Every structure is written in C-alpha cells, then in structure tokens.
Amino acid sequence: MKTKREDVRNIAIIAHVDHGKTTLVDELLKQSGVFRENQEIAERVMDSNDIERERGITILSKNTAVTYNGVKINIIDTPGHADFGGEVERVLKMVNGVILVVDAFEGAMPQTKFVLRKAMELKLPVIVCINKIDRPEARAEEVIDEVLELLIDLGASDEQLDCPFVYASAKNGVAALEISDEMKDMKPLFETILDYIPAPEGDPEAPTQVLISTIDYNEYVGRIGVGKVDNGTIAVNQDMVVVNHHDPDKQKKVKISKLYEFDGLQKVEVKEASIGAIVAISGISDISIGDTLCSPENPTPIPFQKISEPTISMDFVVNDSPFAGQEGKYVTSRHLRDRLMRELNTDVSLRVEDTENMDAFKVSGRGELHLSVLIENMRREGYEFAVSKAEVLYHKDENGKLLEPMEIAYIDVPDEYTGVVIDKLSQRKGELQTMGAANGGYTRLEFRIPSRGLIGYRGDFLTDTKGNGIMNTAFDGYAPYKGDIQYRKQGSLIAYETGESVTYGLYSAQERGTLFIGAGEKVYSGMVIGENAKTDDIEVNVCKTKHLTNTRSSSADDALRLTPPTVLSLEQAIDFIDTDELLEVTPESLRIRKKILDPKMRKRVNR
C-alpha cells in the first residue's frame, strides 16, 4: 500500500546563472546547523569544482541534505546551463517539488525556461524565491508578474500557478513571506518547503526499486550510483538485480556493498534506507544512469527520460607539434584515451569514439561550453593534446534529407547595438522570432539559429556589444539544413620559421593584422601568431633580427613600439580556429597552428 513519508522532503533548486541559488543553499546549510560555529566555510560550498567557482556556474548537479524540525530536506542543485541539460532532466525525477530562485532586479531569465519547462511537464509544485531583495534597484512586484507570465507561457496548471512567493537575501541569510515583513532568518523558507512540497510516497512493503539518476566517481570505491528509493527498502548485503528501461534484456545480479545517505555536505554510511530516501550506492562496477536496482523476485525497471543526444563534436588529437611533450605530463594517445574514457563515468551527455587515425578521438557533447569545460579540466590535470574546430552532428530524416541541430538564442543587448547583432545573426542563418524592450535601455531578441551558426560567434558578440550583451542558448530540436554559412572573414598570420619572436620581426608583422604573441615567445613554423586583416593566410617571419652595419646600432630597435598582443582565452581560441587549424592545449600554453605545418605541403593541398 502506498504511504507518504512525512519526515522527508526532496527538492531541486532551479535558477539562472548568477541569481544566487548556490549562496542560498549555503545559508540553508548554515542555519540548519550543518557547520560548527567556528568552522571556516568556503563561499558557495556547492560549487566544488574549480571551474565552477571561477566561472560562477554550476555544471554538475550536487546533493546535500539539511534537517529542520525533524524533517530531512534533500536539496539538489541543478545546472542552470542548457549545455548541461542532460543533468537536469534526470535530477527532476528524484524530487517532489522545485524552488525557483529569481533575481529581484533581473527578473525571470530565459535560461530558466529550459529547466522550468521540464519541471512543468513533470507536474512538480513550485516555490518562487525572489532573491537579492536587498539590491537598491530591486523591483519585486514587476518580477512576480514576469514569473507568473513565464509559468503561463510554459503551460503551468492552476495548482502550479497558485504557488507561494518567498522574498530573500541569501547573502545576508534572511527571508520573509511578505516584502513588508521583518527579515530575521531563513525560517520562512524552511516552513514553506515543509508546508507546500509534498512528502515522497511509495510502498515500503513492495519489491525494491531504485532508479539511478546521477553517477559520482571516487578513486577509492569507483563508481557510485545516486538515486531515490521509489518502493520497498534497500539494505547493505541485499541481493539485487540491475535492469534498464531502454534495454530490458540487460539484467545483472549484484550485491549492495555500501549504502550512504546525504547529511549536510557529507555522505554518511547507513545500513538500510526506505521509500523517499536519496541514497548513494557503491560496489557495482558498471552501474550507469537510467539503471533500476530491483528485488530479484520481480525486477521491473522504472521508465526515465532518455539522455539528450550530443549536438556538436571535436577531434581530440595527440600533440605532434615541434614543442610536443615539453610542457605536459600526459602526452601519449593511451593517456588521452584513458582520460576521455574516465570522463564517461560521470558525464552521460558525452560520447567518445575512435577514428581511423590511432592518435585521434572524436568527442561529442551538448555544446561548446560543455566541451571547453572538459578541455580546461584536462589541461589543469597536466594533459597535453590538440583539438580541432567544433562541428555539428547532422541527422538524416526518413527521406534522406539532411537535418541539423537548431538552438534558440535569447539575447539582451543595449538598444544601440541591436542592428549589428541582428545583421550578424541573419548572415549566420538566424531567424528573428521576437523582439521587445527589456529594462535599463536593453532590447530582448529571440533567434532560432542553426547550432553551427553560433560556433565562433560569442567572441564577435562581445566585441559588437562592447561586452554589454548577454546571450543564452537552448537546444531546439532538428530542422532541415539551412545552407552554407561563411565563417571567419579574416585569414591567419603564420610563423615562417621556428625560433623566438623578436621586436623587429613583430613590428613589421603587426602592420598586417592583429598579433596573438609578444616579443620573446617561442614559435614554430606553421604556428598561427595572429589574424590577418585580409582574407588570405600569410607567412611572416617574426624571428627576423635587424642586420647590423657600422652605421646603425642595434639599440635603435628599442624605439620600435609594439601594440600589445591580443591574448586569446580557451573559448576565444576554440571560436577562432578554422577547419584547417588545430588548437594546441598544454598546461601552460594555448597555441593555434595549421594542421599541415610544412608550407610547401600546405600550398599543394590547397591547390
């Protein structure tokens, strides 16, 4: 018989990048007594990965739990970025409600639509938390209207529209149910969660069912499956069967060796867990997302949302440049392969395939951000390799027509730059869907555009809007191929010989275009050292020194003034490279190079 488990609540937190959801979770942890009084706490405890802290985004969904008035509240932090949408869909299967965190000034942002739509489809109740209410320019009343409009647009039911609003300042650790109320602590939010979010239900007497929604990985115990106990109970040393909804023939007998529940930020070992509990299970070597752990007597898999397919791919290649092996710790194809295969343990939206070339692997993901985060992680771990230009993954329909992935781009841009943004995106086959005024002299544009039209556009976008534009994208299915797009209009400046760059050589090269290197940097023949102002590639000798004669002194070189070079970030470099180029990634450097380094060979191929 189905019963409710009143001492547990499972909730997910949804928010736009930077609206303060991770800070909110920190405060809930602090005020429920997870930390000791004198304990030093890192800001944004939940963003535990270095890149997450630097970029201020959440990439992996994380689990934590707080106890309030004897009720255990399991909180799951969801990624706000559409590139990591594969995470979101599965996480929502574990919870009974969501908290939508909205900035009191910026209002409901388009990126939240993606996650919120998934929550609406699953009929989950919503608590709206208007955060940053202490901002001087906060406009809470208007934001409430915006949120309700957004919910109506997403087809919310009457129950979902009748949602409670909580006003908070997560930074100060206070919340209230009315703007005029005095704010003391986070109690109003805790109370609202207990009152409004339903308790998980299930049948404790039925055969056990646990759907694995996320995978954690630990060097010591290997793969750890995380999921919610839907029915029955699960205990250590219990015999179970692993089955999968999309692959019903796959059945495997396993034994539960260790079982954990979440408490604060820790995993705590438990002997058994009942319905509604979110548990972590170790000891099953090849457990994967979407598997259901069942009792052997009646194994029935739980249906789950298929993981979104990748839309974009890059080749990861062993570095074969003249400087190969000088800066990295792991440089061989075996190292590269092992590391990519290890990434598959935790990242389910990723695909890795072998290619005809033994030294290259085709890696597919949900977007440029998804892959650039992987590249940056590998680089920090000491790997050295090269990557090719990102390409989209095409499909064919039943008539053999070519289909390509489409995206919806939501853009907020200052009014004076609207024209140039519309012009550039139209050239990239984007279609303007809606256009309207946003607050603060901004215009909000919505484009439907092929994914390949966005490759390499972010750099242009920031330049065109003087850094003031905001662009968010979300995958929007496949559509017929829209025709060819012309990418980079400029050619490359290519180093003519291997050596060290000299002021004299750079001075004559900078008249040709924009340089990416300064004086005293090592270069090799075939390396791209700048962007040509014209459309063709041109070789320049940046290692050329001035011939000394008895009438000229070498000190006259000091008078040559170089324009400071443009140093490309990883994203900008990925955007910049062309189809005949590679980006060499090492722990210390990013270098762009031609695939074929020998100039004579290059000319022959280009004929």
Which ranges hold each PLM region?
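Charge-rich, low-aromatic oligomerization/scaffolding segments with amphipathic character
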Residues: 139, 291-294, 368-384, 421-422, ...
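Conserved nucleotide-binding/hydrolysis micro-motifs of P-loop NTPases
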Residues: 19, 31, 81-82, 105-108, ...
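Canonical P-loop GTPase G-domain recognition
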Residues: 125, 135-195
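Long insertion/accessory domains within large nucleic-acid-processing enzymes
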Residues: 262, 267-270, 403, 449, ...
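A short, contiguous, amphipathic alpha-helix enriched in charged residues
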Residues: 321-344, 559, 563
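P-loop NTPase switch module centered on the Walker A-proximal segment
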Residues: 1-102, 106, 146, 215-218
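Interdomain boundary/hinge elements
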Residues: 41-44, 154-168, 200-211, 240, ...
